[in-house]
Amino acid sequence: MPRRARKFKRAVAPDSRYNSLMLSNFINKLMMHGQKATAQRIVYDAIDIMGKQENKEGLAVFEQGLKNATPFIEVKPRRVGGATYQVPIEVRPDRAQTMAMRWIIKAARKRTGKSMAERLASEMLEASREQGAAVKKREETHKMAEANRAFAHYRW
């Protein structure tokens, strides 16, 4: 029996405009220093930009981009004897989504010039077309897992 009480996940309220839990989580990940209103403005502006550029609903482009950047498998280091092996493991759906969000935000922040909303929109558009830094990161992760497939039996 564990000594500590179990830590439960807090329920996140869906966002006000699109009533989407995924978008609410994305806004929370983008938020810095508790400035939620600023993060919301950036995300909503980015969705509007994506909608105009693609002539589709912005939220659909957002969801497609997030889906394309979501990894299925990752590697975790496991120490066996004196060696550390990179063991490929499947990613839980909630963690996979979190990783994709993190990668997209990081890639958007690395881009130069323009406003954050425009950078985020361009990164999301590229992700929806299976291009961009976030999708490249996912491909890298999958390649790493494939290369270390021999150590899959060390899974725990």
Curated annotation (Swiss-Prot):
HAMAP family: Ribosomal_uS7_B
GO molecular function terms attached to this record: rRNA binding; structural constituent of ribosome; tRNA binding
GO BP field: translation
Alphabetical list of InterPro entries matching this protein: Ribosomal_uS7, Ribosomal_uS7_bac/org-type, Ribosomal_uS7_dom, Ribosomal_uS7_dom_sf
Positions of disulphide bridges: none
Entry GO terms, CC: small ribosomal subunit
Subunit structure: Part of the 30S ribosomal subunit. Contacts proteins S9 and S11.
Protein name: Small ribosomal subunit protein uS7
The keyword tRNA-binding appears for this protein: yes
Organism of derivation: Dehalococcoides mccartyi (strain ATCC BAA-2100 / JCM 16839 / KCTC 5957 / BAV1)
Keywords: Ribonucleoprotein, Ribosomal protein, RNA-binding, rRNA-binding, tRNA-binding
Family note: Belongs to the universal ribosomal protein uS7 family.
Organism phylogeny: Bacteria, Bacillati, Chloroflexota, Dehalococcoidia, Dehalococcoidales
Job of this protein: One of the primary rRNA binding proteins, it binds directly to 16S rRNA where it nucleates assembly of the head domain of the 30S subunit. Is located at the subunit interface close to the decoding center, probably blocks exit of the E-site tRNA.
